[in-house]
């Protein structure tokens, strides 16, 4: 199986690192194109992958082709490569706001499309991806792509109408988490904890808490209640967060990201 990437931005680099670290394909089975060779040089030096500046060459060689370019560049890239793409290839799109219908329309023919919203924790093998596909993708082909994304984290099949929600909660989600870690660490530093230790305490607390949710199967509210002793320190802090509107702020932020993704999709369809 030959896996190709057109574009080598942060998301693509995270995915490629995860794929090669987990040995999903060998470096010789992975080809990446990018207009700037500097972007691919690090991956080439580290893993020995095949790199080029020729998008058509990647399209020709790939069994599974990942389009990892900015949404505004999609039409130009698809126009460039569409004559090289066959009905046997699987096209994976990871751009926000680009629907499968829009991508297929740009190709101007029936193509197998899997739309995915991954996130950057793929770089450390802890990504979260939502996947859907069009009617030309077989169950076996979808499973193959699903396994690729599971190699660097968790992956869930969804319907395309839920992609906006996935963008809001997990595609953009790491940024919210980093802000929370930063805020917790700042508060700890204000209380005298050294900066480096403050980040470790904050980040590990979020990591451990997330694993508790995933591995125990308990409701997050139930786990929260278990930490809140009567008249204790935790319930005092929770009370402040509730007064300051933490829940509503997070809900509004996720909703705003989802709405923005929906708006981007509408613009692409015009």
What are these regions (language model features)?
Residues 1-60, 189-190:
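NAD(P)+-binding Rossmann beta1-loop-alpha1 motif at the extreme N-terminus of oxidoreductases
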Residues 166-175, 196, 224:
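A short glycine-threonine-serine/GTX helix/turn-capping micro-motif
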Residues 37, 46-47, 55-60, 64-131, ...:
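Rossmann-like NAD(P)(H) cofactor-binding subdomain of soluble oxidoreductases
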Residues 30, 40, 58, 194-202, ...:
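Small-residue helix-packing motif on alpha-helices
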Residues 203-270:
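NAD(P)-dependent Rossmann-like dehydrogenase/reductase catalytic/cofactor-binding core
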Residues 102-112, 128-165, 178-215:
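Internal alpha-helical scaffold of NAD(P)-dependent oxidoreductase catalytic cores
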